């Protein structure tokens, strides 16, 4: 069906006392992203014309964390209930648009469910998201007459008879902007909490003869809110389980789905294998037949076909061509690039460095601000000395160079094609093509040398 224009209100003013944190509750993360950002993303994906974020506690922290230009910041100086929060946003509502109300601490609400709610909203009426619970204690009950929704009664205001009702309000609803403003203006705080409840607009709409249509979410987890860290951790597991299931069904081999975390977006080829305790962050692309060992962290990186990443390796903002091998215990920092068939071994760190085709850095090496050609051997203990305490400088190593162990290359410096650097050399000047560079002092030997002895 053709939908009206729509804006979204996200309630995010709560302090989150039960989180025992200085951080606003809605900024606590689920799958590496603030809870409220999940909700903002859903609103934007729905095509919201405007997103009104109602905030209170920790407003400065929220504004620092959320950089969405589509956000309209609405202050709720006093937290006097959900109806009061909506009243603060009401001046921004257009009469001819629909208003969808969401919550910053309900992070798993799906776009699919919200679209069904939007489609189900009757002309001039309200679309309401409800669920049935075996134990509805603490939640507002949905009242009906002849099957039609007539209102919502909060648990504290409900009679014993009403408390037997299992259908409860999730708090998520959609209505026309002009109607919403009119109903909000009629709210009172005549209840056990002394607050203005948004739920009271259901009864007001019913009294006007407006239709209220209830829609159920696909999964209960979509409407579960977070009030403490235990609830947040449970939703994290729900989310991760869902992501792992999708990946398994798409052909990714997760050795143990319960020990895999996706904190972003994973694009993958065929026959990808991921071992236990792997974390994927940001936007990651894995080519065909990629293998990732246990304990690895991959963030914002592209991994080419047939690459193998051994256990406990960290890869961030890096780009690997096909058939590269990394680790174990390697670290690729932002700007690291490996060309086809390159190898980075254990305890090797790269940053803003390119390792050419078939080149190898096997162990105990730092390569920073470096361009390394094809078929280069970097010996154990090699360091590109790229920083003088104020500025960074580049090291350039040509094709077919052999760098011996325990070499220091003091940038800026260039090593020509086919050159050899002897073990233990400190390179401070450019090395020509096919030359041997050696800076060790001649070895001397003193016969019968006696080591110093500590005085007692």
Curated annotation (Swiss-Prot):
Main subcellular localization, coarse class?
Answer: cytoplasm
Can you say where in the cell this protein is located? Cytoplasm
The reactions it catalyses are:
alpha-D-glucosamine 1-phosphate + acetyl-CoA = N-acetyl-alpha-D-glucosamine 1-phosphate + CoA + H(+); N-acetyl-alpha-D-glucosamine 1-phosphate + UTP + H(+) = UDP-N-acetyl-alpha-D-glucosamine + diphosphate
Annotated binding of UDP-N-acetyl-alpha-D-glucosamine, by residue: 11-14, 25, 76, 81-82, 103-105, 140, 154, 169, 227, 333, 351, 366, 377
Its pathway? Answer: Nucleotide-sugar biosynthesis; UDP-N-acetyl-alpha-D-glucosamine biosynthesis; N-acetyl-alpha-D-glucosamine 1-phosphate from alpha-D-glucosamine 6-phosphate (route II): step 2/2; Nucleotide-sugar biosynthesis; UDP-N-acetyl-alpha-D-glucosamine biosynthesis; UDP-N-acetyl-alpha-D-glucosamine from N-acetyl-alpha-D-glucosamine 1-phosphate: step 1/1; Bacterial outer membrane biogenesis; LPS lipid A biosynthesis
Residue segments, region Linker: 230-250
Q: Name one GO biological process term.
A: cell wall organization
- What general EC class does the enzyme of this chain belong to? transferase
Q: Which GO terms describe its molecular function?
A: glucosamine-1-phosphate N-acetyltransferase activity; magnesium ion binding; UDP-N-acetylglucosamine diphosphorylase activity
Positions annotated as active site in the UniProt record: 363 (proton acceptor)
PROSITE patterns (UniProt xref): HEXAPEP_TRANSFERASES
A single GO CC term for this protein reads: membrane
Residues given in the record as Mg(2+) binding sites: 105, 227
Cofactor list: Mg(2+)
- Locate the region N-acetyltransferase: 251-456
Q: Where is this region: Pyrophosphorylase?
A: 1-229
CDD domains assigned to the protein according to its UniProt record, in alphabetical order: GT2_GlmU_N_bac, LbH_GlmU_C
The record's cofactor note says: Binds 1 Mg(2+) ion per subunit.
Sites where the protein binds acetyl-CoA? 380, 386-387, 405, 423, 440
Q: Gene3D superfamilies annotated for this entry?
A: Hexapeptide repeat proteins, Spore Coat Polysaccharide Biosynthesis Protein SpsA, Chain A
The function of this protein is: Catalyzes the last two sequential reactions in the de novo biosynthetic pathway for UDP-N-acetylglucosamine (UDP-GlcNAc). The C-terminal domain catalyzes the transfer of acetyl group from acetyl coenzyme A to glucosamine-1-phosphate (GlcN-1-P) to produce N-acetylglucosamine-1-phosphate (GlcNAc-1-P), which is converted into UDP-GlcNAc by the transfer of uridine 5-monophosphate (from uridine 5-triphosphate), a reaction catalyzed by the N-terminal domain.
NCBIfam families (UniProt xref): glmU, PRK09451.1
Its protein name is Bifunctional protein GlmU
Taxonomic source organism: Escherichia coli (strain 55989 / EAEC)
Give the encoding gene's name: glmU
């Amino acid at each position: 069906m053709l939908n009206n224009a729509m804006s979204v209100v996200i309630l995010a003013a709560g302090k989150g006392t039960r989180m025992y944190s200085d951080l606003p509750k809605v900024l606590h993360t689920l799958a590496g992203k603030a809870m409220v950002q999940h909700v903002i993303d859903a609103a934007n994906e729905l095509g919201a014309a405007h997103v009104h974020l109602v905030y209170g506690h920790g407003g400065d922290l929220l504004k620092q964390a959320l950089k969405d230009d589509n956000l309209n910041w609405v202050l709720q100086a006093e937290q006097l209930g959900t109806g009061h929060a909506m009243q603060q946003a009401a001046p921004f509502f257009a009469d001819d648009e629909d208003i969808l109300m969401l919550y910053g601490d309900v992070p798993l609400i799906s776009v699919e469910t919200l679209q069904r709610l939007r489609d189900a909203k009757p002309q001039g009426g309200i679309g309401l998201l409800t669920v049935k619970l075996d134990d509805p204690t603490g939640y507002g009950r949905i009242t009906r007459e002849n099957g039609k929704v007539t209102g919502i009664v909060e648990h504290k205001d409900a009679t014993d008879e009403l408390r037997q009702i299992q259908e409860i309000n999730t708090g998520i609803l959609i209505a026309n902007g002009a109607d919403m403003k009119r109903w909000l203006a009629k709210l009172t705080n005549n209840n056990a909490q002394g607050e203005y409840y948004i739920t009271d607009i259901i009864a007001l709409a019913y009294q006007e003869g407006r239709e209220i249509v209830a829609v159920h979410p696909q999964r209960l987890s979509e409407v579960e809110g977070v009030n403490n860290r235990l609830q947040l951790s449970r939703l994290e597991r729900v989310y991760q389980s869902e992501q792992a299931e999708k990946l398994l069904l798409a052909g990714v081999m997760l050795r143990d789905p319960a020990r895999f975390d996706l904190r972003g977006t994973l694009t993958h080829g065929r026959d990808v294998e991921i071992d236990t305790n792997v974390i994927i962050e940001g936007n990651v692309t894995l080519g065909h037949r990629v293998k990732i060992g246990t304990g690895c962290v991959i963030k914002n990186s592209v991994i080419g076909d047939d690459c193998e990443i051994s256990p406990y390796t960290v890869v961030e903002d890096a780009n690997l061509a096909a058939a590269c091998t990394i680790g174990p215990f390697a670290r690729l920092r932002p700007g690291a690039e490996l060309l086809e068939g390159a190898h980075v071994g254990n305890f090797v760190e790269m940053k803003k460095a390119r390792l050419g085709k078939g080149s190898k850095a096997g162990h105990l090496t730092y390569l920073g601000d470096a361009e390394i050609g094809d078929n280069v051997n970097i010996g154990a203990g090699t360091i590109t000395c790229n920083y003088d305490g104020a500025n960074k400088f580049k090291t350039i190593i040509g094709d077919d160079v052999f760098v011996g162990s325990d070499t220091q290359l003091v940038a800026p410096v260039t090593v020509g094609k086919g050159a050899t650097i002897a073990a233990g050399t400190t390179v401070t000047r450019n090395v020509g093509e096919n030359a041997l560079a050696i800076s060790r002092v001649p070895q001397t030997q003193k016969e019968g040398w006696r080591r110093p002895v500590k005085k007692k």
